[in-house]
Amino acid sequence: MSGSKSVSPPGYAAQTAASPAPRGGPEHRAAWGEADSRANGYPHAPGGSTRGSTKRSGGAVTPQQQQRLASRWRGGDDDEDPPLSGDDPLVGGFGFSFRSKSAWQERGGDDGGRGSRRQRRGAAGGGSTRAPPAGGSGSSAAAAAAAGGTEVRPRSVEVGLEERRGKGRAAEELEPGTGTVEDGDGSEDGGSSVASGSGTGTVLSLGACCLALLQIFRSKKFPSDKLERLYQRYFFRLNQSSLTMLMAVLVLVCLVMLAFHAARPPLQVVYLAVLAAAVGVILIMAVLCNRAAFHQDHMGLACYALIAVVLAVQVVGLLLPQPRSASEGIWWTVFFIYTIYTLLPVRMRAAVLSGVLLSALHLAISLHTNAQDQFLLKQLVSNVLIFSCTNIVGVCTHYPAEVSQRQAFQETRECIQARLHSQRENQQQERLLLSVLPRHVAMEMKADINAKQEDMMFHKIYIQKHDNVSILFADIEGFTSLASQCTAQELVMTLNELFARFDKLAAENHCLRIKILGDCYYCVSGLPEARADHAHCCVEMGMDMIEAISSVREVTGVNVNMRVGIHSGRVHCGVLGLRKWQFDVWSNDVTLANHMEAGGKAGRIHITKATLNYLNGDYEVEPGCGGERNAYLKEHSIETFLILRCTQKRKEEKAMIAKMNRQRTNSIGHNPPHWGAERPFYNHLGGNQVSKEMKRMGFEDPKDKNAQESANPEDEVDEFLGRAIDARSIDRLRSEHVRKFLLTFREPDLEKKYSKQVDDRFGAYVACASLVFLFICFVQITIVPHSLFMLSFYLSCFLLLALVVFISVIYACVKLFPTPLQTLSRKIVRSKKNSTLVGVFTITLVFLSAFVNMFMCNSKNLVGCLAEEHNITVNQVNACHVMESAFNYSLGDEQGFCGSPQSNCNFPEYFTYSVLLSLLACSVFLQISCIGKLVLMLAIELIYVLIVEVPGVTLFDNADLLVTANAIDFSNNGTSQCPEHATKVALKVVTPIIISVFVLALYLHAQQVESTARLDFLWKLQATEEKEEMEELQAYNRRLLHNILPKDVAAHFLARERRNDELYYQSCECVAVMFASIANFSEFYVELEANNEGVECLRLLNEIIADFDEIISEDRFRQLEKIKTIGSTYMAASGLNDSTYDKAGKTHIKALADFAMKLMDQMKYINEHSFNNFQMKIGLNIGPVVAGVIGARKPQYDIWGNTVNVASRMDSTGVPDRIQVTTDMYQVLAANTYQLECRGVVKVKGKGEMMTYFLNGGPPLS
């Protein structure tokens, strides 16, 4: 057996000092005295005895000890301890309290509290590992917690609250420079990161840059078709909104085109019909696209239909209107191209093909209709440059937007995947936790963890008192013989087979298994819910156990049997200590039940008179004569009985119950119970279903929580994400979290986090805007007469923009440049304010380059010159007078007319087109808010329209006359005939309208982009928070789990989801085992009304065990593993796994010896300050053991073997206040200069005579 089965009560805890030093002044001794007095049922006077106030053991008190004492006992300097009220809530219910989550996240200093002192003590060293000081970094701690390196060592059983290394919310991590918005380089899955969270970037080679450039033009698609469909569903509502918005602006453009055509007769029916039909088709599509029946499969069809409509409008708009001009239709072609890239939800390839096709159509039709113009080449080259620029800007806008969307989707999916994985593991841990601790205990603990509780002087305990229960102890007789014939695996399998059956029987007989002690099994009926038939349940359980062991006897051929002892009475149940919790029961009645088993007979059920009274004569009994076989029963004059058989009445009742159970089973379609052995954790790790869905993410919980589990975790994530996408409401998310016009978050914290995001593509935005500047320069150099001012201005702007691009791009290539440049680049890119200012500066330069050459053009009014030449009024001048003029005015003539020395700018509309390109450059900067863009674009529009309408109006009036005249001359083929109504809509009228249309469209696009980005940020943030909440719960449950099972054992099962039916067993070559028992605690334990029927005694035992737990938690004892407590016996071992077993240096053996001596010192200190005389006996042994987990429904880790039995005998045959070791242990310790003395030969049960030794001290100090 693993140790003595004597179950004496527990309950008490303390802090471990670096040495057995006093725990403070008289008030601390008063505290111990009060605990001692209450435990023994006597009153306590706070100002009473101060015995030992000047007595010290262990010399002077170190500062670390003083800090520890202060935190252990009192938070202030009061002379009196707070009295323990007689109606302490711990008696009637679980008063066990925990620190709140905030306490174990950050233990700040509180006036007079223990939090700061405990932190200082932990920092000083020499104590157990504690929470880091407030304000310290928790990253390493979090990593340690995640790796399972920290076990729960709660203060007041605070369940790891002091050791929590909880990760902060993702929202708290969204600081400047963390690179939360990653860049994509065009990979198939949405782009890889070019993040710069650490301030370092990636050095890109020329080849990599070229590949990245080529990747831009590739359509993005996830490798998995299912994932791609999910992505399309993810953005379906947003794409639907974009499509609707595009249709609206297209209708607006068509109406503007109709208005322009109607303003210049004669009207062309075909033109009007096509545009009207286009408007009608677009409106019908808009209605259809917003119907409920419209879904993702229809999106592509609608997009391509819209492209077809745009192409039709493009062809008709260029072929039919008069007067003809190669510059006609440029503005709407640019508009169509750009909106296809930005508002039409199509792939990059389709957008590029559409843009190129629209550009080619315009160029081809212009070439066809204006072939006779001598200046056509200039216009075509300029048009090519404008369309090329528009396509490039469209690509520069479409690419990062799609990459950002795909990345947001991927990151959200990864958050959900991690959350579901954490949730599955968390559910496994919770099932495992609830399999070890009864639900009411575990739930009470978890409730107290989240509740704020004030620090108390002593550790709190969970103790519940239950009257009228029956306790069953059962021991396998002949287990030693069985174990000697089995291998390690066979032994674990056999025990698991047997105890699995016992667990099933316990469930069927309404018994709660308490613990397995080696080959001893004990359970209680009447817990946690009271039952009137608790005695019947225990008797039936005993009969079934005896029947079950018979099958083992038949299969193995070993003479094994069961001794069963039952007693009915009162118990205290709960957990004790700080580590390796095991639910247990304590009371004098439990002790009596244990002795009933020891004094029983093999194959028989041994009951007391109290149990017999509860059986109501349903069983035939005979005298048990237990006193003849057990001294305890004889000493206490316990009348015992042996069950013979149940009466006929009881047989009929059992048959009726069995029949009802069968009917209930058949009615619900269950299969008959399977009697094969279950595997540990099989019942607790098998489920992968999702128990709750994400909340606060804009969608409701799924209704069907019993959906079939997905065999593939990836499929489960996709299914979950699909349900989330279907359930989320974009409109509701937007209305709840985002303001309508400003598009700012309603919550200031959210807005602050969003504003701190870093856009690593800022350098690309500046580069794209600079590229627009170059195109504008080339357009104007081609179409506008050259001047020195033009060249000097463009060169200056180019140098400035090159510098801005250089500084901005350094951010992604920081390793190549000096530190000052890196710092400057980082300050610009990582600050939204600075990057916005730089962006505005860049756009301003581009805008200036678009119109500044207007001031170098001839400003003479051609209308005035013609009126003077023809001797007519200004209002009478028309295009015919241009044709009739003697000066041969023409569009191709750049010589200044009317005697002006300045050159003619006969195509001022290209200034407007250049301004449109500058507006497109504004839209490239995705990090600028839509309101900021609107203000900037309105400023550009206002300035340019004022220039057009005031100083530059003559340029546009002159151009109108020349274009009309050129068209008339072409249509007349050289004749002098002049039409009556040869006119066109004036450019000074057209210009404000088309710029306003562009500003509106670009604002709507900016609003759509920012709205999408904010919703993506919100959804990802909420998904991340959900994931981190689950990870925190998972980490917490893992610490709870590690407080029940060794870390390597828990990891073994939790990491093998698909192999959870394997048994866990391990043969350990050389393990040191310790049993430490308080020999006279049973004498101390009394059940009186004054001490709450023994609860105060258990409180004292809890303090002692907690002190031992804190000692074993110290770093120097990291090789040790607490196995369990058995009443007042503390069991530990070292060298149970590869990380703690030191084959060469035997350090794990020395560590256990040091631990044993530390416990002795601690017990002396406790006696001094609690005014008690507890005597501790400790036994040590080394040798091979078998470690494993047994029990399917309530898995329990334990060790077995001869080594364990002998260590237990070293304890039971030991001498009070001495540490007894075996010869094997002696040889190792003596070789390391430990101080030992020979005790002599001792008779050991089952082993005969053994030579033993006493451990007196460690190696002498050098």
Swiss-Prot record:
Biased composition annotated in UniProt, kind: Low complexity: 47-59, 129-150
PTM entry text: Phosphorylated by RAF1.
Annotated region (Disordered), positions in chain: 1-196
Guanylate cyclase domain mapped to chain residues: 470-597, 1072-1211
Biological process according to GO: adenylate cyclase-activating dopamine receptor signaling pathway; adenylate cyclase-activating G protein-coupled receptor signaling pathway; adenylate cyclase-inhibiting dopamine receptor signaling pathway; cAMP biosynthetic process; cellular response to forskolin; G protein-coupled adenosine receptor signaling pathway; heart development; intracellular signal transduction
Gene Ontology CC: cilium; endosome; membrane; plasma membrane; sarcolemma
Enzyme Commission identifier(s): 4.6.1.1
Named cofactor requirement(s): Mg(2+); Mn(2+)
Function in brief: Catalyzes the formation of the signaling molecule cAMP in response to G-protein signaling. Mediates signaling downstream of ADRB1. Regulates the increase of free cytosolic Ca(2+) in response to increased blood glucose levels and contributes to the regulation of Ca(2+)-dependent insulin secretion.
Protein name: Adenylate cyclase type 5
